[in-house]
Design a protein with these regions (language model features):
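Flexible glycine-/small-residue-enriched beta->alpha junction loops
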Residues: 29, 33, 39-93
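N-terminal extracellular/periplasmic Venus flytrap/periplasmic-binding protein-like
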Residues: 103-173
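Proline- and acidic/polar-enriched loop/turn elements at helix boundaries
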Residues: 12, 44, 52, 106, ...
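A short, structure-level motif marking secondary-structure boundaries and short turns
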Residues: 13-14, 74-76, 100
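Conserved catalytic cysteine-centered active-site region
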Residues: 1-38, 69, 81-88, 151-173
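Preference for short coil/turn "hinge" residues that link or interrupt alpha-helices
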Residues: 7-10, 30, 47, 61, ...
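Active-site-proximal alpha-helical scaffold in enzymes
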Residues: 16-46, 88, 94-123
Length: 173
């Protein structure tokens, strides 16, 4: 409403962790393809760092300890069918299909190199809207993805510890 859209316009949010923005655009495209809409404004951003912790308070709370759930994990990263973190699913898939740590690291290095080359070639310039961030060091303009690991190597990937199991193969790479 504050953006100037009429009250009868449909709007909703999507909570699919990192895939939310992409899913919003895919749903928008489907609405246009199916003839449900002529024009759709869609986009997204993820902010997992600020996902709230939630408590069951509908019926109130009596004396004693109260548990909170991490909504980022519970709503987006928890396997509802098996009752464990999606990271465990990644480990299970790696084991089932015999995808070892070296194979995963090699894939990660390749992905990082492709992203680095695309960033250096300016392929993302039209995809990212620059914005100002204020922090204790002053204002900073963010105009490119900060998490591409320039100069990624197998050696740098192999220094990463397993993320989900002590002897696992899945890392942050």
């Amino acid at each position: 409403i504050n953006a100037g859209f009429p009250e009868e316009s449909a709007a909703w949010g999507i909570n699919q962790v990192c895939g939310s923005g992409l899913r919003a655009v895919a749903i928008a495209a489907q609405h246009v393809q199916l003839g449900d809409a002529d024009v759709v404004a869609a986009g997204g951003q993820e902010n997992m760092s600020l996902s709230p912790h939630v408590a069951h308070l509908r019926a109130g709370h009596k004396m004693g300890h109260m548990s909170y759930l991490d909504s980022m994990v519970r709503d987006g990263l928890w396997d509802a069918f098996n009752g464990y973190h999606m990271g465990q699913t990644a480990e299970n898939v790696a084991e089932k299909w015999q995808i070892n740590r070296d194979m995963q690291d090699e894939f990660a290095v390749g992905s990082q190199k492709k992203a680095e080359a695309a960033q250096k070639a300016g392929r993302f310039v039209d995809e990212i809207v620059p914005f100002k961030v204020k922090d204790r060091r002053g204002d900073k303009i963010v105009e490119q993805d900060e998490y591409i690991r320039h100069g990624a190597t197998m050696e740098s990937m192999q220094k990463l510890r397993p993320a989900f199991l002590k002897d696992g193969t899945v890392t942050a790479a």
